Amino acid sequence: MRSLAILGSTGSIGLSTLDVVRQHPEKFKIAGLAEGHDVALLAEQIKEFLPAAVSVRDADSVKKLQTLLGSHKPEIFHGLEGAAAIASAEGVDMVVSAIVGAAGLLPTVSAIKAGKHIALANKETLVVAGKLVSDLVKKHNVHLLPVDSEHSAIFQSLAGHRAEDVERIILTASGGPFRNTSAEELKNVTLEQALKHPQWTMGAKITIDSATMMNKGLEVIEAHWLFSMPAEKIGVVVHPQSIIHSMVEYIDGCVIAQLGSPDMRAPIAYALSWPERSESGIHKLDLPKIGTLTFEEPDMERFPALRLAFEALKAGLTYPAVLNAANEIAVAAFLDRKIGFTDIAATVEKTMQAHEAYDPIELDEYLQADRWAREMAKKFIA
């Protein structure tokens, strides 16, 4: 039986993970849960899964949780340090890293240092500090298993093949809700329109990132670190049906792809069960019913966030950390209706242009770039 700690248990990935766990009580047990926004839902999760320890956002949330709990009272931590304690606790075999944004970096690093295998949904961990995290994974001999559907697809399509036989990897993108929207119309996009993704049900931040195509940009950087692939060997193709989750092209011209219904429970179940497979509960594909699969080139003029991500990856140093931090601030401002849709990428670009990059070594040097970019982005927004 595999003992799990879930960071971000009340979010979209956390809920899907618990649904997979619920289907396989003989395979998985919950040792720890961490969340930041929904204490009431966490209380219900604690009553069902009986974890030994949990973490909440702050001290006030600790008090609120204590009043909601019944007879089962786990050890309660709070803050990022609390999430790190959950992730590195004795008895945990695997950590599902699903905290949104750069906030997931510290707990994930703590888990790796404690020798825990990682099911990674928090792509920002590799975007912000890819080299540091990759080095730690090797040093502590842990598995870093992708939960993102695209990276899970690449991981599965690479299985059994030699790295030197890979020509390139191809990430698919749905194109988001504005795939056919003109550049002029994008300036007037509303928050409500941006939150309506055509294929996936996700949290607000990643839904906006999908609409700007920044999510695909972050996934390009994540793929670079997960698969040791240079930017020149990472392609993106728009695939509106979201049935092919990604592909690997080999030097002989053959392409291997992974297909499935657009449901995060499939890549989650694969990461939790690897190297085996488990029933995920998703709808099985009916290819005749789907009928047609289509593909398009991404438009980096209308969606400059994707271009900025490729530029950050190629430039290296602290640019990816700055890209991510500025984007988090800009998306939050858009969600608060303080800036327009096209201002998101514009804010990121201005912040990157203002940055004097350096070569980070220690974790705090990565976090320093993150903090700088957040403050600079706020100034541009103000």
UniProtKB/Swiss-Prot annotation:
GO terms for biological process: isopentenyl diphosphate biosynthetic process, methylerythritol 4-phosphate pathway involved in terpenoid biosynthetic process. NADPH binds at residues 10-13, 36, 122, 124, 203. Its EC number is 1.1.1.267. InterPro entries: DXP_reductoisomerase, DXP_reductoisomerase_C, DXP_reductoisomerase_N, DXPR_C, DXPR_C_sf, NAD(P)-bd_dom_sf. It catalyses: 2-C-methyl-D-erythritol 4-phosphate + NADP(+) = 1-deoxy-D-xylulose 5-phosphate + NADPH + H(+). 1-deoxy-D-xylulose 5-phosphate binds at residues 123, 149-150, 174, 197, 210, 215-216, 219. It holds the Pfam family DXP_redisom_C. Belongs to the DXR family. This is 1-deoxy-D-xylulose 5-phosphate reductoisomerase. It comes from Pelodictyon phaeoclathratiforme (strain DSM 5477 / BU-1). The gene is dxr.
